[in-house]
Amino acid sequence: MSRSGTAGYDMSIIFSPQGKLYQIEYAFKAIKTGGLTSVGIRGKDCVVVATQKKIPDKLIDPKSVTSLYKLTDYIGCVQTGIVPDSKSQASRAIQECATFHHKFGYQIPPNVLAKRMADIAQLSTQHASARPLGVAMILIGIDDELGPQLFKVDPAGVFTGYKATAAGEKEQESTNFLEKKFKSNPQLSKDETIQVSLIVMAISTLQSVLGADLKSSDLEIGICTMDNRKFVIMTDEDIDSQLTKLAERD
């Protein structure tokens, strides 16, 4: 976008004559600059998030690089976008979870947390002294009444529930791939889902849109199931097992 076209309206949170908030548009573009792609898929008995893992330097300890965050024992998220913004938003989410539990005496439901994080993000679109976060949060958890839950919170302060969603560099390609999968297999959204199928689908989505065979060191996967309800980050050994199952299917 040319500077002459924005006429200074992109310098702060202020509407242009065309009704646009350029800082928000730039925040959405910033999500893609990290070069990572993440997906989330919800079934009847579980919900899964998967994302790429890239180590920017050979001397960095791989264990210190992550896009997956455990917000409570029962809720987790994958953050896609600018890394410092991701850490800041995840830290705030953990704080909100703790505050809710202290105030009400029970764990915060996934939809309540998603709405709260969206409200906080939306505040950054109202003040000239603030800027939107360049990150998309895909949040998962198990609701006591509604079962598996999958939400995405964007820089504009919008949160939406999904059957499947994506974020990052290959967001549109991943969305198209998932739409075809759900169209060809509508049972995913109606009947009981085997959690292995969701994990394999998440991996195959990333491999398809990236055009590469991924190793366990290239992936991070988190899952919540109706069995134990807790958010679990899969180990490299578990991911290797799923990659083997995917290879056998192909």
Curated annotation (Swiss-Prot):
Q: Does the keyword Ion transport apply?
A: no
Q: Which Gene3D superfamilies does the record associate with it?
A: Glutamine Phosphoribosylpyrophosphate, subunit 1, domain 1 (3.60.20.10)
Cellular compartments annotated? Cytoplasm; Nucleus
Give any single GO term for biological process. proteasomal protein catabolic process
Q: Which CDD domains match?
A: proteasome_alpha_type_6 (cd03754)
Entry-linked PANTHER family: PROTEASOME SUBUNIT ALPHA/BETA
**Subunit description:** The 26S proteasome consists of a 20S proteasome core and two 19S regulatory subunits. The 20S proteasome core is composed of 28 subunits that are arranged in four stacked rings, resulting in a barrel-shaped structure. The two end rings are each formed by seven alpha subunits, and the two central rings are each formed by seven beta subunits. The catalytic chamber with the active sites is on the inside of the barrel.
What name does UniProt use for this protein?
Proteasome subunit alpha type-6
Organism expressing this protein natively: Dictyostelium discoideum (Social amoeba)
Q: Which gene encodes it?
A: psmA6
